[in-house]
């Protein structure tokens, strides 16, 4: 049902974009309406599950407890920061690029950002699929099964990250052509370097996502929050400005790879320490 609702929303968006923009001539207003109709369609389909004989969810009366709300917010805040940091990083990069090179560099970054959005969406999907399983087996105290799913998630992220990196290196020209229909040579040259350098971050971004979803699943929101904060806020600002000072435009494209690599190192230390703690606790019990 979740897949049907999600895919249906996307299909409705595509169809209504064509109808509202080209058939009705509504322009950007039509595109906006089509975009609004997409999640609305998904919501309607999900709501129909209430009347399905196979339903496993139902509405119940409950009292709102501040302690429960606080716990929910503490666990989910790292995911919120993950989403919000993307907008912050884009804003920061645009300011730096505008002052450093100009509008051509911003156009190049727009192409990189679109590619990054696709990669992040897939990484998010992997994490959201793994988190319920991690939470379940952590709650049941089955640490061996938990480690099995952590290993599987790690391998999945590792393979996906390498594939995205490889695609970015091999098909750079084809990716640029999708956005550079006018054949601007300067834009193509800057974007080619930008994609190939920025794509190094894909090797570590997914692994950091794994850390965020893992620590959220095992009720360690502070660790998840630390990872989100490091990669999205606290590291990117100093790293970006230091690399720009040292390397100019090249430093902009290398900023995220450096940030993701450093964050991964710190996340790995935290994960190994917590894994050893779970092993010791398991041995005692």
Describe the role of every protein-language-model region.
Residues 4-11, 33, 37, 77, ...:
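Hydrophobic residues within alpha-helical transmembrane segments
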Residues 10, 83, 87-91, 100, ...:
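Recurrent gating helices in multi-pass secondary carriers
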Residues 16-17, 46, 77, 89, ...:
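Hydrophobic/aromatic residues in alpha-helical transmembrane segments
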Residues 11-15, 88, 122, 126, ...:
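Residue positions within transmembrane alpha-helices of multi-pass solute transporters
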Residues 3-7, 45-48, 61-92, 97, ...:
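Hydrophobic faces of transmembrane alpha-helices in multi-pass small-molecule transporters and flippases
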Residues 19-26, 87-114, 118, 136, ...:
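Helix-terminus/linker motif at the lipid-water interface of multi-pass membrane proteins
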Residues 12, 23-76, 134-200, 243-285:
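Short alpha-helical transmembrane segments in multi-pass integral membrane proteins
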Residues 1-2, 108-172, 205-224:
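Small-residue-rich hydrophobic transmembrane alpha-helices
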């Amino acid at each position: 049902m979740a897949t049907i609702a999600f895919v249906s929303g996307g299909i409705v968006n595509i169809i209504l974009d064509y109808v509202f923009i080209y058939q009705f001539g509504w322009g950007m207003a039509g595109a906006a309406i089509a975009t609004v109709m997409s999640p609305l369609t998904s919501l309607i389909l999900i709501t129909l599950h209430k009347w399905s004989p196979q339903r496993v969810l139902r509405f119940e009366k409950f009292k709102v407890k501040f302690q429960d709300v606080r716990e929910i917010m503490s666990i989910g805040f790292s995911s919120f920061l993950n989403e919000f940091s993307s907008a912050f990083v884009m804003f920061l990069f645009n300011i730096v690029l505008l002052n450093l090179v100009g509008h051509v560099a911003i156009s190049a970054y727009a192409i990189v950002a679109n590619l990054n959005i696709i990669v992040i969406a897939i990484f998010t999907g992997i994490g959201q699929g793994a988190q319920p399983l991690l939470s379940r087996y952590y709650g049941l105290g089955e640490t061996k099964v938990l480690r099995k799913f952590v290993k599987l998630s790690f391998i999945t992220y590792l393979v996906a990250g390498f594939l995205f990196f490889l695609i970015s290196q091999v098909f750079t020209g084809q990716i640029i052509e999708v956005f550079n229909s006018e054949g601007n040579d300067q834009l193509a040259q800057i974007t080619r370097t930008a994609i190939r350098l920025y794509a190094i971050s894909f090797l570590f971004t997914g692994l950091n996502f794994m850390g965020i979803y893992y620590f959220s699943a095992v009720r360690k929101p502070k660790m998840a929050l630390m990872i989100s904060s490091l990669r999205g806020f606290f590291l990117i600002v100093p790293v970006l400005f230091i690399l720009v000072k040292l390397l100019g435009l090249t430093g902009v494209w290398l900023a995220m790879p450096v940030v993701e690599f450093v964050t991964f190192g710190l996340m790995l230390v935290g994960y190994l320490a917590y894994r050893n703690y779970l092993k010791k606790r398991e041995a005692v019990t």
